[in-house]
Amino acid sequence: MLDTPWSDGVPGISQGQIRPGCIFTFTWKATQHGSFFYHAHSSSQINDGLYGPIVIHPASSTPAPYGLITQDAKSLAAIQAAEKTRMPLLISDWRHIESGYEWESSRNSGVENPCFDSILVNGKGRVNCLSKEQQAALITPTRQMLLGLVPGSSLTDKSCLPPSVITILAAPGAPPPNFTAIPPNFFNGCRETAGSTEVIKITQESASDETWVMFDLIGSLSLQTIQFSLDELTMYVIAADGNYIEPETVQSVVITTGQRYTVLVQLTEPKTYAMRISGINDPQILFGNALLDFQIVGETQSTQPTMPYINEVGQNTTASVKFLNPDAIRPYLPDTIPSAADVTHKMTSLVDGQVIYWAFNETILPLDTEDFSPLLFGPQPGRRDNHTITNPSGNVWVDYIMQVPNLQPPHPMHIHGRHFYVLGKGEGPFPWANVAEAQAANSSAFNLVNPQLRDTFPTPAGGPKGSWLVLRRRSDNPGVWLMHCHTQSHIQGGMSMIIQDSIATLPEVPTEYSSWKC
C-alpha cells in the first residue's frame, strides 16, 4: 500500500467504520504483483465471510523464476500462459455461528472456541461428521496425549477436543472457565451436509499441447493452519505472500492464516484430481476438498480415483511425500539488507486477564479503537506507549523481536504498509539487546544474506521455555499501520499494535477520505 495509506482499510487507524448500508470506494496504487486478499478488520467480520481474493499480474519485464524449473521453450511458453490465467483458491475455515454471538459467548464462558464446521474452497464445501471409529483411526499422538490430561475425555461429535481439555491448554493467567455458558453447538452438534464442491475445469485442446496451471493458495483462515495437496501431482511453489522465491518442489504446502503461496502444476494425464485440505491444529480434526477436472480433447479421462499424498489430519500417506519447509524458503533475486537495524523493538505476547484477550506488548490494543477517529487523519509524532510504535522518518530499518514467554500457539504475525524480512527464530528466551548481540552468541540462528520477504509469518509455538521470532522491516512508507496476529480471535482480543512510519513526510489525506462520513 505504497503512497496510499488512507486505503489500508483498518478502522480507527487509517479510515472510519463502514456502517451497514454505506458504500465506500478504495482507490490505491498497485505497485506490487502477486497474490493477496481483501478482508474486514472490524470485529470478527472476516469470520462471517467478508473477504475475497486479489491477484495482481506482474509486468512483462518482471524477472520470474520459471527458468529454474525448466529450460524447455515449449514448457516455458505453457507456464507463461498459465500465469495469464492463474486462479485463486480461497481457503477458509467456516462456522455455522454468527461471529458476534460466538465472541460474546466465548467472553462469557472464558473458553476460546477452536471448533469449526467445515473447510471452504472459494466459498464451497461441506460438513464432515466422523464416527467414533473414524476418529480413533485418525487421532494423532498429540491429541491422544491431550485427551489423557482429562481422564475419560474423548473427541466431541465435531471431532474437537472438549472444553475441559481446551481450558488446560489456556496460557497461564487465565481465570477459571464457566462451562455452563458455552452454547451446546460450539463443540457438539455435528450435522453432515451435502454442500457444493469447487471444481476447476481445465481442457487441453490437443494431445501435442502442454498444460500447466497456476494456483494462488490464499489462507483466508480464521484460526486453522492447513496442509494443502493435489493427489498424484507435484507442485512447484514459486511465490510466498506475493514475492517470487526459488522454486520448491513439494507435494504438500502448509498455510497459516493470512499467508499466500503461488504454485505451478504440470498436467499430463486426463483425470479428476482431488485437492485435499487438512487442518493441523491440535484442537480439531477438520478437512475439506475441491476437484481439478483435467481433460484432453480426443482422449478418454481416467475414472480411477486418485491416490492422496496426505490424509484427513495432514499426515503423509507414504514416506516419499515432500512437505514445504517454510523456514527453507529463499527469495528469487534476493535484496541486500543492512547488517544492522537503526531501531530495535522487543515485544512480549501474553494472555491479558482472560483467555480471549491476547496482548502483543504486554498490553492489549483497546477494543474500541476501531470506533475512534482514524489516527492517520491526525498522527501524533510523540506517541510512544505499550501499543504504539513511532519510528523515525526516512529510510530507517527496524527490527521487531517477538517474544513468546510460555506455552502459547504460534501467532501468525502480519504487518501492514511494508513486507518484512524473516531474519531468524528460536526456542527459549531472547536475552540479547539486539540482533547483533544475538548473532555474536548464535550466528547460525540468523540469515542476513538471503532472508525471505513476507508479510505474514508465525512465531514458533511457545514451549515451557518460550520462543522468539525476529523480523526486519523498512519504515520508509509514510503511514499509520497495524501490526497484528492474524488469528482472528487474537486480533479481536487485542493482539495488535499501531506503527507510525515516517509521519513527518506523510502526504495529505485526500478530502474524499478525510471528510467521508456514514
Predicted regions and their residues:
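A short beta-turn/strand-edge loop motif at beta-sheet boundaries
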Residues: T225-Q227, L407-P412
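Short coil/turn segments at secondary-structure boundaries
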Residues: S7-G9, H41-S42, G52, E102-W103, ...
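Histidine- and aromatic-rich segments of cupredoxin/plastocyanin-like copper-binding domains
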Residues: D3-P11, Q17-R19, D93, E98, ...
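Extended terminal and domain-junction accessory segments
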Residues: L50-S109, W212, I245-D399, Q403-P410, ...
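Active-site-adjacent, His/Asp/Glu-enriched structural segments that form or flank metal-binding
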Residues: P20-C22, A30-Y38, S42-I46, I56
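Extracytoplasmic beta-sandwich strand-turn segments characteristic of Greek-key/jelly-roll folds
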Residues: M1-T31, S60-S75, N185-S206, M235-T268, ...
